[in-house]
Amino acid sequence: MADQYHGVMQKIHDHTPNPTQILGFITLFVSGAILLLLTGLTLTGTVIGLVVLTPVLIFFSPILIPVATVLFVAVAGFLSAGGFGLAALSAISWLYNYIKGRHPPGADQIDYARMRIADTASHVKDYAREYGGYLQSKIQDAAPGA
C-alpha cells in the first residue's frame, strides 16, 4: 500500500508545474485582468459619451454637417494642390536634367521611343513616296495626255 502511495505521489509530483510556469501563469492572469478592466472602462466611457453627446450632435447637426463638408473639401483641395504642385515640380526637374544631358531615370526609354517614332515616320514617308509614284504612273496610264 505504501508503494502505491509513493507511486501516485511521484506521478503527481512529476506533473506539477515548475515555479517559472507558475510565475508565467500569474503574469498572464494579471495582464489579462488588467486588459479586461481597460476594455470595460473604454466601453463604458464610449457608451456614456454617446448618451451625453448624441442629443448635442443632433441639435447642432444643421451647423456641423455643412462646416465639416466645407472643411473636408478645403483640406482635400489644399492636399491635391500640393500633390499636383509637387508632381509638376518633379516633372520640370526631370525635364531640365534631360535637356541638360544629365541622364535622369527613364531617359533611355524616352530616347528609344523617340527613335522608334522617327523610324516609323521615315518608313511612312518612304511608303507614301512609293505609293504616290505608283498612283502617278496609274494616272498617266489611264489618261496618257494628262
Swiss-Prot record:
Transmembrane segments: 22-42, 56-76, 77-97
Residues found modified as N-acetylalanine: A2
Topology versus the membrane: Multi-pass membrane protein
Reported tissue expression: Expressed in pollen (at protein level).
An example Gene Ontology biological process: lipid storage
Organism: Pinus elliottii
InterPro entries, sorted: Oleosin
Record's comment describing the protein's domains: The proline-knot motif may be involved in targeting to lipid bodies.
Transmembrane listed as a keyword: yes
GO cellular component: membrane; monolayer-surrounded lipid storage body
Keywords, in A-Z order: Acetylation, Lipid droplet, Membrane, Transmembrane, Transmembrane helix
Motif (Proline-knot): 55-66
Name used for this protein in its record: Oleosin
Pfam families: Oleosin
Major location category of this protein: other
Cross-referenced PANTHER family: F27J15.22 (PTHR33203:SF4), OLEOSIN (PTHR33203)
Localization (cell): Lipid droplet; Membrane
